[in-house]
Amino acid sequence: VLSITSAQAGWDPNKSETAANQNIQDYEVQQAITDFRNNDPSMKVFFEKAYGFAIFPTVAKGGLGIGGAYGEGKVYSKDVLNGTSSLMQFTFGLQLGGQAYREIIFFKDKTAFDLFKYGNFEFGAQVSAVAATAGVSANTDYSNGVAIFTIAKSGLMFEASVGGQKFSFEPLN
């Protein structure tokens, strides 16, 4: 008779992996925030005055006729971590390539923030993000309580496509 038992050694590899992934994502989130601040110093006002923000350190996007994007991020109100979020996007139209970018969504007030937290938040095709480059945020305002900025990380993508972004929110326990 063959018997397999598990010995408890005080180590749960699943918990360690989760903790390691958490540390990696925390570093990536901090690096993304630093990148947004450094690319456009005038973005400081959004960080100071916004009720909250959702930041996605890496959104991977690709397409060949039909495309998609996915990213995971963190959601803050007044610099306090409230939870995590995922971003999904499906597009159709003329598109070819792949790219990675960072995305940040600022929420002007509690109403906009709560809409994000308590529903399946979605941006339609008519809402667009602004590329965060020096000085651009000085001329950018909120639309429907949100302001969205992106920074390219890598890749090249040609597209004339239509699609929206859908978000989910998972509060901290």
Give the positions of each predicted feature.
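Sec/Tat signal peptide C-region and signal peptidase I cleavage site
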Residues: 4-9
